A protein has these predicted regions:
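Structural/interface elements that position substrates and couple domains in central-metabolism enzymes
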Residues: 1-311
Length: 311
């Protein structure tokens, strides 16, 4: 039989859910890694030529295989690192008189830093960030780079801490018990414009709320089917597509996904339907907190402290 020779290339994708088609049609860059051999470079150039039919050549980057593989992991690790970094600062902002949004804007105007992924929140999710960071940490451990592994592990640890901290804020704000109280959760997808719930912060938040014997009512425009699967083993959880129905007789409302529809809800109507005092916990900092406080809400946000009528 005639022998078959082939080359293995690395061509990591950098697509984001919700913008995958546009990311493919007009990517920031395409990265192709090939072996540094004659046949490896021929194979690499073949794939370059395919991409060059619709992508400008200057956006097509080439490297060796290891560089391409690590670039994928490092890209997601750096993005997640920014989220965990600003979330770490959000805790300090709450302890002082700082506003994390103002801090993020101030540092984001520095051209060396930029403004993307500097929005404090309940945490990052999705199928890639945690997986890729843990992969990076594992590689570091494999090569005996323990300090580097611990550094990247801390990005994940900080994210999980932020989710737990959000639940503790709810508990402490509501007089240290939520047993028997109805808590409406708006948003379950890990981010807006997708029904994907993989590694969504809402999973751990809702499970912790339920473990405190709260009655949790979850609403989301696209993710309810996945939410039911993710929380199949949890008790005390209900699902309601209509956000206005979800908040009826609720003692608290928590925003966990930055859906645009939540920015335009009638919050006077929501306040009127809730038990009093009506608590609102904005885990994505997407609402007008001053306006909500004027309506009558007890407002708690990430990195901004609280606006309350109870003091």
């Amino acid at each position: 039989d005639k022998q078959v020779h082939f080359e293995v290339l690395s061509n990591p994708e950098f697509l984001a859910e919700g913008t995958a088609i546009s990311d493919l049609e007009s990517p920031d860059r395409v990265l192709i890694g090939g072996h540094e051999t004659e046949s490896g470079q021929v194979a690499l150039q073949t794939l370059v030529d395919i991409y060059a039919s619709w992508i400008p050549r200057e956006r097509i980057l080439t490297s060796n295989v290891w560089s391409a593989e690590l670039s994928k992991l490092t890209a997601n690790a750096f993005l997640a690192q920014r989220v965990s970094s600003i979330n770490a600062i959000s805790q300090l902002c709450e302890a002082t008189e700082a506003n994390v949004a103002e801090v993020a804007h101030a540092i984001g105007t520095d051209s060396r830093i930029g403004s993307k992924f500097l929005k404090a929140s309940v945490g990052f999710g999705g199928s890639c960030f945690k997986k890729d960071i843990l992969n990076l940490a594992y590689l570091c451990e494999t090569y005996g780079l323990h300090e580097a592994a611990a550094y990247w592990q801390q990005v994940v640890d900080m994210n999980e801490f932020q989710q737990n901290r959000f639940v503790k804020t709810i508990l402490s704000s509501m007089f240290n018990t939520i047993a028997g109280k109805r808590i409406a959760v708006l948003g379950f997808a890990f981010k807006a414009d997708t029904g994907d719930t993989r590694e969504s912060p809402a999973i751990s938040v809702c499970k912790e709320l339920a473990s405190e014997q709260a009655q949790v009512v979850i609403s989301d425009p696209k993710a309810l089917d996945n939410a039911e699967k993710d929380l199949a083993d949890a008790t005390g959880i209900m699902f309601e597509e209509d956000p206005y129905e979800a908040v009826v007789d609720a003692h608290a409302l928590a925003i966990l996904t930055e859906w645009d529809v939540y920015k335009t809800l009638d919050y006077q109507r929501i306040f009127d339907a809730m038990e009093k005092p009506a608590f609102l916990f904005d885990g994505r900092n997407i609402l007008d907190h001053t306006a909500l406080h004027k309506i009558g809400f007890e407002v708690y946000s990430i990195g901004k402290g609280r606006l309350t009528h109870l003091d």
